């Protein structure tokens, strides 16, 4: 890297803040490094967004859900979410749908990895030679 970023490192959060995007990250399993590693291996950071502020994550990652709770997220069961989906999506609250399951994680997949778009935007045809 000619600009020297490789030697000194790049602080992503600091860089984003300097351009006006000040984010507050929620770390997988909080601040305990041992718990972070444990829940990372059970896909604690793997989530699927349903709407702004609403996403699906594994219920088995209890420390990650607790950390999300400390950042204002409400944890709900899938059945409650389905009964009140419009309320949760349109309500503006921060919600995590806590998906139960231990078998799926064995295949190294979380909620994001287990999705497939049902509709896609049409893409423009490629020009010849590109």
Predicted regions and their residues:
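Histidine/cysteine-enriched polar flanking segments
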Residues: 1-130
């Amino acid at each position: 890297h000619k600009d020297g970023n490789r030697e000194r490192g790049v602080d992503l959060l600091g860089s984003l803040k300097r351009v006006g995007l000040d984010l507050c990250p929620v770390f997988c399993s909080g601040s305990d490094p041992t718990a972070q590693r444990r829940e990372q291996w059970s896909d604690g950071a793997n989530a699927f967004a349903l709407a702004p502020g609403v996403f699906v994550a594994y219920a088995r990652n209890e420390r990650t859900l607790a950390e999300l709770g400390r950042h204002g997220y409400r944890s709900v069961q899938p059945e409650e979410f389905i009964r009140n989906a419009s309320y949760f999506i349109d309500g503006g609250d921060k919600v995590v749908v806590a998906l139960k399951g231990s078998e799926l994680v064995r295949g190294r997949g979380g909620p994001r990895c287990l999705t497939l778009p049902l509709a896609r935007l049409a893409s423009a045809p490629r020009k010849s030679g590109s």
